[in-house]
């Protein structure tokens, strides 16, 4: 969840004006204590316990051995279409990075939105 904390607080990312939503297989009851302890206040935490969102955005193609998605970022445009998607835990990423530097995410999102 440190990624969410940093996205919420980084002024460079916030200047892009892109809302962030964190979606996890974990229930809200499982997510809430850590989110509260980390001070996550401006990023909605959603549960995808039935995998409907993961299936809709086809992120299960990068699922880890347990069947859970890895660490996927999806930028959805105003029309609901995927403008950019990147999974940082995919099998083709040997480092299976679970934290992506905010500067990298800011750069990729900036490119995708043309800023």
Residue ranges and their predicted role:
Residues 35, 57-58, 86:
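Short, flexible helix/strand-to-coil boundary loops that buttress conserved ligand/catalytic motifs
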Residues 36-38, 60, 102-105:
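Short low-complexity, flexible loop/linker segments enriched in glycine and/or proline
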Residues 26, 49-50, 78-79:
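Solvent-exposed coil/turn segments that connect beta secondary-structure elements
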Residues 67-115:
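Thiol-/selenol-based redox modules, centered on thioredoxin-like
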Residues 47-59, 110-115:
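Short, positively charged
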Residues 40-44, 60-74:
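Structural micro-motif
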Residues 46-47, 102:
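A structural signal for well-ordered alpha-helical scaffolds and beta->alpha junctions
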Residues 1-41, 52-53:
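Structural microenvironment flanking redox-active thiols in thiol-disulfide oxidoreductases
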């Amino acid at each position: 969840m440190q990624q969410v904390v940093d996205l919420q607080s980084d002024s460079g990312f916030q200047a892009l004006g892109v809302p962030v939503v964190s979606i996890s297989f974990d229930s809200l009851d499982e997510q809430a204590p850590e989110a509260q302890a980390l001070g996550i206040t401006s990023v909605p935490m959603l549960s995808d316990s039935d995998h409907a969102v993961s299936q809709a955005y086809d992120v299960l193609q990068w699922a880890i051995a347990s069947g859970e998605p890895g660490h996927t970022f999806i930028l959805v445009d105003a029309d609901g279409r995927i403008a950019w998607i990147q999974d940082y835990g995919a099998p083709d990423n040997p480092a299976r990075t679970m934290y992506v530097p905010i500067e990298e995410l800011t750069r990729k999102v900036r490119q995708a939105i043309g800023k």
